[in-house]
């Protein structure tokens, strides 16, 4: 359940900064992209914390 939820949110969040991440090629590295997205979307600390713990 956590993985599915995180994946859905991750996809939605990553939808916008995809171009930026794609440029660096870190789109494939989920952790790197997640951290980058977390920094840009720091207004969602709930999801960041949940994904980080998982």
Curated annotation (Swiss-Prot):
Induction: Repressed by RicR. Induced by copper.
Superkingdom of origin: Bacteria
Region annotation Disordered: where it falls in the sequence: 1-54
Name by which UniProt lists this protein: Uncharacterized protein SocB
Species this protein is from: Mycobacterium tuberculosis (strain ATCC 25618 / H37Rv)
Organism classification: Bacteria, Bacillati, Actinomycetota, Actinomycetes, Mycobacteriales
